[in-house]
């Protein structure tokens, strides 16, 4: 079955994969995908030429067809992060929020993996380049658990092939 496109929260493009895709084949759980689709901003860490980290706020969307996280933004192909990924594909993305202040409850998803710089432009010449992250390690906190005692929330970590 072909992939379906739609609009997610905030009017962002959402790509759905084939209906035959099972959760076991997906790098993210259903709850993690829902969390990502509800967020508009993440922080992308890449490696600069001198080996130091660069961390920038970025737009994002989950690509269920490929099981990747696509980083989007204006003039992406001219950005330092795009050049960093072109040179060294190691990257990490953190998406977090405060779910509650009473009691204090935070949630986050950290995705470490291999990133690729994907050039692109539309017929009008606009830059449509993206950074595509292929998850290799996923850390989540407060995503899978129902609201409850915050001190019982545990970090979940898993490595992917």
How would you describe each model-predicted region?
Residues 40-75, 93:
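Short beta-strand segments
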Residues 75-131:
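Short, structured beta-strand-loop surface elements
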Residues 37-39, 52-54, 108, 124-126:
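Short solvent-exposed loop/turn micro-motifs enriched in small/polar/acidic residues
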Residues 28-31, 56-57, 78-80:
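A generic local structural motif
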Residues 66-68, 90, 114, 137:
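Structural motif
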Residues 14-43:
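Short, basic/aromatic recognition patches
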